[in-house]
From Swiss-Prot:
Cited HAMAP family: DnaK
Function statement: Acts as a chaperone.
SUPFAM superfamilies the UniProt entry points to: Actin-like ATPase domain, Heat shock protein 70kD (HSP70), peptide-binding domain
Gene3D superfamilies on file: 1.20.1270.10, 3.30.420.40, Actin, Chain A, domain 4, Substrate Binding Domain Of DNAk, Chain A, domain 1
Entry's family note: Belongs to the heat shock protein 70 family.
Sequence ranges of Low complexity compositional bias: 578-598
Superkingdom of origin organism: Bacteria
Acidic residues bias (residue ranges): 599-617
Modified residues (Phosphothreonine): 175
Xref: Pfam families: HSP70
Name of the featured protein: Chaperone protein DnaK
Transmembrane segments: none
Amino acid sequence: MARSVGIDLGTTNSCVAVLEGGEPTVIPNAEGARTTPSVVAFTNSGETLVGEVAKRQAVTNVDRTVRSVKRHMGEAWTMGVDDKTYKPQQISAFILQKLKRDAEAYLGEPVTNAVITVPAYFSDAQRQATKEAGEIAGLAVDRIVNEPTAAALAYGLDKTDKDQTVLVFDLGGGTFDVSLLDISDGVFEVKATNGDNHLGGDDWDQRIVDWLVTQFKNANGIDLAADKMAKQRLQEAAERAKIELSQASETHINLPYITAGAAGPLHLDEKLTRAEFQRMTSDLLERCRTPFNAVMKDAGLNVSQIDEVILVGGSTRMPAVAELVKELAGKDPHKGVNPDEVVALGASLQAGVLKGEVKDVLLLDVTPLSLGIETKGGVMTKIIERNTTIPTKRSEVFTTAEDNQPSVMIQVFQGEREFVRDNKSLGNFELTGLMPAPRGIPQIEVSFDIDANGIVHVHAKDMATGKEQSMTVTGGSALGKDEIDRMVKEAEANAEADKKRREAVEMRNEADALAFRTEKLLDENSDKIPEDTKTPVTEAIATLKETLKGTDNDDEVKAAMDDLNQKASAMGQAIYAAAQQAQAENPQGQDAESASSESGDDTVVDAEIVDDEDEKK
């Protein structure tokens, strides 16, 4: 039976979980880790690397490595590699494919469905792009769930016996959300949410990078920011330093041979204290206050009414962040959840809810931003206010601005500003065929429908003629069905090609090991093997080694392996026959040894057993 999983598609790291026996369980990746770096790289040989292996090679492959692509979801951003152009949805799909593949290996069965989480403050276009990424990866996306809501579900599923007001403070690698929820009798209701889609751990890392660049430039007169490889090393060192400063009061950043000057190689060696780090990032910390205050105001609550605070996202491990949360909420955060895993666990629970495996649970989420259309004068006329529970549907009746207007352009926006120029455009469509009439007479009903994924559908109808037009708002970066289908096929083709490359690499490694083992056995038993058996084996080893020096000759390597295995089998038989002959020629020696043993001699005789079958493998 195909399985459904929960996926936290993160800016810095991603995580996948599944329900096992009714309990949410994190699935380790192929490398054995519980989270996977959200990094994708394209090698010069055409291979696509994802996760830790992509992260490790980033320094030497800067231009062909992508990280933090989540920050570009819903945008018209692209990355060119050789003769191909990749959109954020495709890069994210590579990450999702790896998570899917690792989950299938762990479960031993196909994974076809997923619940994928997004930041609560993601716009419609960003949600649509995330759904498309799942489709490209070969997943049926059952639901898009807000990360704080998923975290609250994982925290509170076994705590529904009493009413609770829970604050979720989610500071990830690239995004920040604050959500306030009521938990009661299995109902998880979001009261308000707010956030910043361009605030996260990456920004703290960048401050360390900027500081290191300044320190090095002041000392050596060289701008490391202009050197791509040096900058990549700085970014990795900054991330490590940030993590270390969460535990220690100071850390040393040492990067030997970071660049070269007129006198030779130059090294970077700096000491960074926690106090200095907090000073250089204090403005980032202050930006966390505004969404918190907005959520409390929108929910109409004060901090004394918060029962529990949940920290989500690796960046909440920074002491300054934890202290800020304690100051804002007036209480210590809950320590019982893993910030890196709780979102994926909650997503797997929601997958279980949708499959009917988890009973008596209802999630009531909200739309994070107001939705409306442009009216005369560029005014943003809101139809659905922010923090409205979804799914929902609202309608308003509008009219024409000019006499005898034959059509109206419905332009859809998302945001809180009074004028559309300051808000995010989600798309537009035209309602044509209006009957000639003075301005203000025609009646046009515009309906907004937000589904459970937070994706917007808009419908316009001329009340006089009955003519209507509708669209799913997808934003300028969204993909058409044909384009998604093409990308799905490309992704499948890439997955098959990568599988063949892995199999080829494994075969060549096996061939190298076979040559080594056979050569070692030959050297250790040279006196027991006749020349007419030894010579073909020696020649077969040499042939295999020479074949391994080539490239794109996998069939030749396989043939050379088979030849060596066959000849090694004859060698094994010769060794075994020699051992039997030696035993037959010296039976009295055995009796003497036995008698000696019986007379109290404790001499131990070591014997090596050569398994002929092993040599054939």
